[in-house]
């Protein structure tokens, strides 16, 4: 039996495209997302809170919601 996904995959794709389009350097953006997801994963492990959303997807959603993702802007 398939489990229901608690988030919309189309929204994550849209958000990731929004992040990529706003970045002047995709490598730096990719590293920021990966590092933040890695931190979230370890925080989740330490607090024993296990989310059904993978850390990378949660990080993309958080970065778009923060409105601080524009640190790496196009000029």
UniProtKB/Swiss-Prot annotation:
Keywords: Chloroplast, DNA-directed RNA polymerase, Nucleotidyltransferase, Plastid, Transcription, Transferase. It is found in: Plastid, Chloroplast. InterPro entries: DNA-dir_RNA_pol_omega, RPB6/omega-like_sf. GO terms for cellular component: chloroplast; DNA-directed RNA polymerase complex; mitochondrion. GO terms for biological process: DNA-templated transcription. It comes from the Eukaryota. One of its GO terms (molecular function) is DNA binding. Its main location: plastid. Its EC number is 2.7.7.6. It catalyses: RNA(n) + a ribonucleoside 5'-triphosphate = RNA(n+1) + diphosphate. Belongs to the RNA polymerase subunit omega family. May be involved in RNA polymerase activity. This is Putative DNA-directed RNA polymerase subunit omega. It comes from Mesostigma viride (Green alga). The lineage of its organism: Eukaryota, Viridiplantae, Streptophyta, Mesostigmatophyceae, Mesostigmatales. The gene is rpoZ.
């Amino acid at each position: 039996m398939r489990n229901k996904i608690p988030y919309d995959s189309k929204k994550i794709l849209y958000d990731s495209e929004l992040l990529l389009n706003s970045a002047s350097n995709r490598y730096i953006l990719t590293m920021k997302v990966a590092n933040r997801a890695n931190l979230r994963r370890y925080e989740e492990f330490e607090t024993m809170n296990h989310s059904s959303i993978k850390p990378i997807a949660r990080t993309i959603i958080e970065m778009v919601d923060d409105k601080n993702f524009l640190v790496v802007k196009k000029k």
